[in-house]
């Protein structure tokens, strides 16, 4: 299967923060699903993606979407620590980025954080959340041209 085109993903990426009308507070996986579906090389829907979805058949979880991309479509990502030094290795690249355990949810202590984020990475910038405090336990990166 062909890898998605970064520019096509960028063009298909939703312009709104919460594209789903359901009450999901964190919609990064939904936004990435919409971009993937719009790009056309990788489809996220009920016949291809079995993890939890919103009513529109978009992925709801960042980690489950990242694992699905790894297992079924893009192969093993470059896996980095959350450090600033490691991020420099991808700073001038484009692709899909997954931040593992980058923020605390609800009543979690920061040391027990489990919040994840998936996004487009455009030469050091994302479309939404950015882990500027380098809190991620891991950063996964799939380079796309």
What are these regions (language model features)?
Residues 51-127:
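...with weaker cross-activation on analogous glycine-rich loops/strands in unrelated enzymes
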Residues 35, 99-102, 144:
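Active-site-proximal beta-strand/loop segments in catalytic clefts of secreted hydrolases
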Residues 20, 64-66, 136-138:
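Acidic, low-complexity intrinsically disordered regions
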Residues 3, 58-59, 131:
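Alpha-helical interaction segments
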Residues 1-55:
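N-terminal capping segments
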Residues 128, 132-145:
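Low-complexity, Gly/Ser/Thr/Pro-rich intrinsically disordered linker/tail segments
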Residues 46, 111, 133-135:
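General "foldedness" signal
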